[in-house]
Amino acid sequence: MPTYTPKAGDTTRSWYVIDASDVVLGRLASAAATLLRGKHKPTFTPNVDGGDFVIVINADKIAVSGDKLTKKFAYRHSGYPGGLRKRTIGELLEKHPTRVVENAIIGMLPHNKLGRQIQKKLKVYAGPDHPHAAQQPIPFEIKQVAQ
């Protein structure tokens, strides 16, 4: 009997909601990336998008350990010569808190077509409200050690 290989349409996708209040950014990102890829499922296949949808709320209340707020930078480039811009993570958290969380999670996903497809299942919101109540998301709690 041949080995069972799941196809993209074979998986049932769940919706998870993660509250980012006082959760360390890297721990949140690795947990969300695991759910998005489907690595928590017994039918995980690296070349198939079998993951779940993830909603992250309260992105503006994320915790960043150490002195990363002032010493870690987020870079972006306009595409023109001399168009490299950098901001500290603290500045970016004030203006666009969702972008900090999105970049951390996307950095832990594959950097190819499959990764871009998986990114579409990530929804990040700065406040406690989200428009996905109809999907009945399951609360996902990140267990963390005391800081």
Curated annotation (Swiss-Prot):
The keyword Ribonucleoprotein applies. The keyword Ribonucleoprotein applies. Keywords: Ribonucleoprotein, Ribosomal protein. Gene3D superfamilies: Ribosomal protein L13 (3.90.1180.10). One of its GO terms (cellular component) is cytosolic large ribosomal subunit. CDD domains: Ribosomal_L13. Pfam families: Ribosomal_L13 (PF00572). One of its GO terms (biological process) is negative regulation of translation. GO terms for molecular function: mRNA binding; structural constituent of ribosome. Part of the 50S ribosomal subunit. NCBIfam families: rplM_bact. Belongs to the universal ribosomal protein uL13 family. This protein is one of the early assembly proteins of the 50S ribosomal subunit, although it is not seen to bind rRNA by itself. It is important during the early stages of 50S assembly. This is Large ribosomal subunit protein uL13. It comes from Mycolicibacterium smegmatis (strain ATCC 700084 / mc(2)155) (Mycobacterium smegmatis). The lineage of its organism: Bacteria, Bacillati, Actinomycetota, Actinomycetes, Mycobacteriales. The gene is rplM.
